A protein has these predicted regions:
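Nucleotide phosphate-binding site architecture
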Residues: 23, 61, 65, 83, ...
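Walker A/P-loop NTP-binding motif
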Residues: 30-42, 53-68, 89-94
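Conserved pre-motif I regulatory segment
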Residues: 1-45
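The conserved Walker
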Residues: 46-50
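Conserved nucleic-acid-binding Ia/Ib motif block in the N-terminal RecA-like helicase ATPase lobe
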Residues: 8, 12-16, 69-119
């Protein structure tokens, strides 16, 4: 299945995928997309480099409202390195959008005031 087959995908996400030459969905992305869009909880497992981050970020982004400044999603990850990676991916995707969405990585053992200010 190709990302272009998804009718609900936002233009910004489509632009990000095109710029990164990502055309086909990976197995983990195909298996999880509809469940996440249907607001269902999932537990999925896949090897490194199979597209897990985009498997959950793309449907989350497609569900976000652009007319509010409230926190709409929280992604909880087990390590600071993964938090930074996920946040960088979000920032890359948001750069292809209308600048109404923002993200921040909040990491333990780091100055919380500065992190809160980044939200």
């Amino acid at each position: 299945m190709k990302f272009s087959d998804i009718e609900t995908i936002s233009h910004g996400v489509s632009d990000y995928l095109a710029d990164n030459k990502i055309v086909d969905m990976t197995e983990i992305q195909r298996q999880t997309y509809k469940h996440i869009m249907d607001n269902r909880d999932i537990i999925a497992c896949s090897s490194t480099g199979t597209g897990k981050t985009l498997a959950y970020l793309i449907p989350i982004i497609n569900r976000l409202r652009r007319d509010t400044h409230n926190i709409q999603a929280v992604v909880l990850v087990p390590t600071a390195e993964l938090a930074i990676q996920v946040n960088n991916t979000l920032k890359d995707i948001f750069a292809h959008m209308d600048n109404t969405l923002t993200s921040a990585a909040l990491i333990g053992d780091v100055n919380i005031s500065r992190q809160i200010d980044s939200i």
